């Protein structure tokens, strides 16, 4: 959540965009709102965050977005090693499903991984 909030905050100019509706701005502010110095978006906003950002950037610039996700597999590996793999796969499946499958604001996306598939046990779990 903190990483998503920090990345969303990089686009703070969206708060003042004359191309976004007040509802768009409320959704954006839900992504960057802080509570006790921590980003505090709810789970629904977190899961939709990549799609929301791409939609808002599309509305602002009038051009479809390009989504670059580097080392997507690192959070999965950490989750596997620390016992919260099921929760992480649910989150990533939701985020990527929203951002990549049902996103008319997306031109294309590139995902890279850094772990060797042959050495990653959780790719072979049933």
Where are these regions (language model features)?
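Phosphate-binding site recognition
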Residues: 1-126
């Amino acid at each position: 959540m903190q990483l998503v909030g920090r990345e969303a905050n990089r686009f703070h100019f969206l708060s003042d965009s004359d191309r976004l509706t007040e509802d768009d701005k409320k959704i954006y502010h839900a992504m960057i709102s802080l509570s006790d110095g921590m980003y505090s978006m709810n789970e629904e906003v977190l899961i939709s965050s990549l799609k929301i950002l791409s939609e808002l950037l599309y509305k602002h610039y009038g051009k479809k977005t390009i989504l670059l996700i580097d080392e997507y597999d690192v959070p999965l590996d950490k989750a596997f090693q620390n016992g919260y793999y099921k929760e992480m796969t649910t989150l990533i499946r939701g985020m990527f499903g929203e951002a990549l499958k049902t996103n008319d604001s997306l031109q294309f996306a590139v995902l890279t991984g850094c772990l060797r598939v042959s050495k990653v046990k959780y790719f072979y779990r049933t």
